[in-house]
Amino acid sequence: TKASVGFKAGVKDYKLTYYTPDYETKDTDILAAFRVTPQPGVPPEEAGAAVAAESSTGTWTTVWTDGLTSLDRYKGRCYHIEPVVGEENQYIAYVAYPLDLFEEGSVTNMFTSIVGNVFGFKALRALRLEDLRIPPAYSKTFEGPPHGIQSERDKLNKYGRPLLGCTIKPKLGLSAKNYGRACYECLRGGLDFTKDDENVNSQPFMRWRDRFLFCAEALYKAQAETGEIKGHYLNATAGTCEEMIKRAVFARELGVPIVMHDYLTGGFTANTSLAHYCRDNGLLLHIHRAMHAVIDRQKYHGMHFRVLAKALRMSGGDHIHAGTVVGKLEGEREMTLGFVDLLRDDYIEKDRSRGIFFTQDWVSMPGVIPVASGGIHVWHMPALTEIFGDDSVLQFGGGTLGHPWGNAPGAVANRVALEACVQARNEGRDLAREGNEIIREASKWSPELAAACEIWKAIKFEFEPVDKLDIKK
């Protein structure tokens, strides 16, 4: 038996066991691409092997119990290392994990292994998980999004254009009745959705049950008047899973179409539970990514948002915030389009120019609609329509409620701008080049749009993104 072979105690280099450049990856392996910045004097192979070891079966010394199992079957393997272009002493280490290391249907367990203790490892100056390849053998153990893009369109009876939303502001401090009034005005004016802000849960100035009631009243009234299906993302995020489900149950009893969750602050376990409830009860699920920038904004350490996006698609959500490219929040265009495709499409080819390290095959898992939100207004509409296409939600908070004439005219301005852009695109016009002209033409017959154009004509948020794709300098 293995255990009787004689056990050699002591510390040995990780690379002797965990660096295997000849390894051929299996179709069932979970593959990870890490950006590794070793401490001075640590060779890249040792650093890459250390990552593979610490995120799978290894520990800092040889242990007697290694003899009781088959390390070859269970260990993570660093199978390829390449230097990062334009950076000194920085490498992409590719690690393959056998599928048996992970519990089925648990994003929580997957992340505990892959991005657990290893990120505090002393031999590395910094470590960032850039991408994951999730094999169908694993993704099939997840239910994924409660409904998906096509089911959502069918439920809402809205086709051939992006959907429009609005976050109700001021996000904290309104009473439930006034909050509901703002929802009604926006929906009545032509938006498809209004939204609870991510930090609206159940505070002293507005308890959740009151808000749910007044928002439901608002959307039914707007629905009756416009003949269109309306929704309000009721934020069910709570301090405990039980309380969260209680809120979702009440939303279902009110008959509303959609609820919302903050998936990173709420946690993947809670999120997956809520997604299962939503699927079983016909509720759409809108996901906000509050806290993501803590994890994904630094280029050299943490985890890229494309990994958080893949994890959300597995855990379950029908919408997720995904940057705007043009507004006030972080997001480089090619990189953003890369993870937008990872959210929506069935099959995404490896493409390093868009930050996609692996070909990802989701097989039949439903897609997630990306939400563009944050500092956008009517002048951005042509760019947003062109960048995100029809399967998206464009959310204008200040860009609706900041209209000089009030909320309903703000909603009218956004809807007119969107319909004008969609029509122009369908007629074959170039939105990137003629965008401003299209908006100007539409504003001639829409006084609401003209007023919006006037007030935001010079607003831009021009900063270089912190997290960029690697290119030769």
Curated annotation (Swiss-Prot):
Entry-annotated residues carrying N6,N6,N6-trimethyllysine: 8
Active site residues per record: 169 (proton acceptor), 288 (proton acceptor)
Cofactor(s) the protein needs: Mg(2+)
Reactions mediated catalytically: 2 (2R)-3-phosphoglycerate + 2 H(+) = D-ribulose 1,5-bisphosphate + CO2 + H2O; D-ribulose 1,5-bisphosphate + O2 = 2-phosphoglycolate + (2R)-3-phosphoglycerate + 2 H(+)
Any one GO cellular component localisation term in the record: chloroplast
Record EC number: 4.1.1.39
Subunit structure: Heterohexadecamer of 8 large chains and 8 small chains; disulfide-linked. The disulfide link is formed within the large subunit homodimers.
The protein's name in its UniProt record: Ribulose bisphosphate carboxylase large chain
Organism of origin: Amorphophallus titanum (Titan arum)
